[in-house]
Structures are given as C-alpha cells and as structure tokens.
Amino acid sequence: VFGPRLVGQYSSTFKNIFGSELIVAYFIAMIGFLLAGFCVIGLTDKSSLLRLPVVTDNTSSKTKLDSKATQLTVLLVVNHFVMVIIMAATPLHVQDIGETIQVVGTIISYHTLGMFVFSPVLGRFVDKVGSKKVSITGGFILLISCICALNTSDIVILHLSLFLLGLGWNFNFVSISSEISKYSIEKNTNLNIKSDSFVFVGSVFAQSSLGLTYTLIGFEGLVIFGTLAAIFLLFNLVRLSSKLLT
C-alpha cells in the first residue's frame, strides 16, 4: 500500500538508478510479504502445512481426502488467485499507459480500502445472513470487477475495478474461512492452517510468475484469465452452496 506512496516522493531518482520506480515499490511489498510468511510459518504447526485434509473411512479404515474441506480450500485459493493476478499486474499496466506512480498508489489504496473497509463488520454479517449468501454475493462482485478491468484504458474504471476486486475477495475470504472454521470445530482439527498454507503458496506462485505472464499475454490477457477463473469460482459457489455453505 505505502510502496508507491513512498517511492512517489523520489520517483525520478529511483527511475534513474533502477530504470523503473516500480521496482522499489515491488521490493518493499516483497519484503513485507516474506516477513509475514515467515511469521505465519514460525507460529503454526508445521505438520499441517500444505497437507490436504483427510478423513478415515469407517468401513476400510483407510484415509481419503475430506471432500468438503478440500472443495472449500480450492474455492479459497481460486478467490485469492483472481485477486492477486489482477492486483499485482495493475501497477505495471497503469505505468505502461503513461500514468504516474502517484496514480498507481491511488489505485492500490482504493483496492486496499475494498479489501478491508468492511472487515470489522463482515464477520457478524456472515453470522447473521449466512456464508452462502455472502460468498455468492462476493463471487458476483469479483466477476464484475474483472469485467470492469477489461476496460483497460479508463483510469476511473480501473479505480472502481480494483475497489470491487478487494471487496469481492473480502466477502469470499471471510465467508469461506468462516465455513472452514466451523467445519474444523466439527471435525476437531485445525483446517484453517491447511487451507491458508495453500492460499499462501498459490499467492507466491501467482506473483512470481506474473512478470513472465504479463510479458507473454499482457494485462488484457491476464484480466481475461482472471475473468474465467472468477466465472469458475462463482459457478462452483452456486453449485456447491447447498452442500458446502450454510
């Protein structure tokens, strides 16, 4: 969030040294991301990381994948993947169309506002109306944000798109995580650590491959890919809502 703001004050200096002032902004973000990752990994049960939840078959005593927990984890990962690829590619695109680093900072600020502005009340809202309604609403918002982002040359629309992208992500993340937490209590295990570890790795993969992908297919291609993933997410949220969500 503060990367573009901090860099904006010295953008000409950084551009002369590194060729692009965005390099420093991304570097600041990468350091914060890695520090957060190390903290999470250091404070969690290592045996739970990157392991899909399993259950024991009562008839054969063999373990098999826990279908509900696995499906919820996949939905959570796809939701995060859609958000990350568009969020991380937008600063590159905005600079490519000739806008300043200050505009990049404003767009990311709008996005962050969408991600967290309703967080203090969203958990209670999920408890009141149910995770099913909240997640399907989030799926629609996420898809609308991707469609808005297809209008790649309009800066005002990009501000709206990134705000909705954060908002839809937040609706889905809170509602699906809430369902995973309830299922964890039911199964007497910590499924949140497992699901969050997959979200973290998915985020690393999406961001680390972004440069090459952006070069190959451009911002429009990434947005189309994100739109298809958002359609997949919404379709499965609707299709599986009666089985997975309350």
Positions of predicted regions on the chain:
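C-terminal membrane-cytosol helix-exit motif in multi-pass small-molecule transporters
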Residues: 3, 7-8, 29-53, 236-241
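Intracellular juxtamembrane helix-capping segments at the cytosolic ends
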Residues: 171-184
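Pair of pore-lining "gating" transmembrane helices in MFS-fold secondary transporters
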Residues: 65-86, 163
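Short amphipathic helix-loop junctions that connect adjacent transmembrane helices
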Residues: 88-104
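A membrane-interface helix-boundary motif in multi-pass transporters
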Residues: 8-31, 212-230
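Structural signature of the two symmetry-related core transmembrane helices
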Residues: 133-148, 227
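Helix-to-loop junctions at the C-terminal end of transmembrane segments
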Residues: 11, 117-130, 214-215
